[in-house]
Amino acid sequence: MIENTFKKRKHVLHYDTKDIPTQEQITDILSKAIPLTTSKQKAFAFKAFVLGPDLARSNKLLTACEASNTEMNGKLGERNLPSNPNPGLYHLATAPYTLIWTPRLVNPNTHYKKKFMKKKGAWEMNNSSSLLKCETQIAIEIGMMSKMIMGVALDSGLDSSFCLCYSRKLSDWKPFIPQIEFSPTIIQTIGKAKSYYWEILTPEESIDNTNPTIEDLFKFV
């Protein structure tokens, strides 16, 4: 059952840097996730740049995300507060595989190309200005795909976590991914966890760290 799969999900603190999945294992996980999700008109107007095992680069990525987090706090008027490392980001430093999800330009498949030609419609996903107007839709679809990847990874005995604290400046990403064309939507890591975030919480913090209720999230009307 899907519940049993996702009950294993925990936010990673540190990945095991010795027990590293092979690229073939990761490719298998990514391949299995594709048919488990969906996209409007099968556009899949997104891609993930997969950064493989490289501890030096992973540490630089953590440093860059921490710097962005500190800068963001400064913009919120908290520049005088001390900068404390965020344990929620630590998984970036040891992740053997890091997926940088971004939008991508894409042409329609043969089926939808014929349909758009027949009705003289305009395909929106193959030019930058139209694509960026669809960022919300693309972000939702990335979320669906990345969650399926997490599920397959969990079923494979691995772990996966997410990060939303990073720079939105495209130029900041060129040193990591020279060919990147759009700012990231989300960062996802995959590997074998060595420790989890919940393990560093005090008993009081664990009690306070609650999920919203069903009443908070759903309203029957």
PLM ranges: what are they?
Residues M1-P108, E215-V221:
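N-terminal amphipathic, basic helical "cap/leader" segment at the start of enzyme domains
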Residues R9-L13, G151, T202-E204:
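Short, cationic motifs built from Arg/Lys/His that form the positively charged side of catalytic pockets
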Residues A64-C65, H111-A122:
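Short, flexible, mixed-charge acidic loops at enzyme active sites
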Residues T70-G77, F176-T202:
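A glycine-rich helix N-cap at a beta->alpha junction
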Residues A95-Y97, S156, P184-I186:
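Generic beta-strand structural signal
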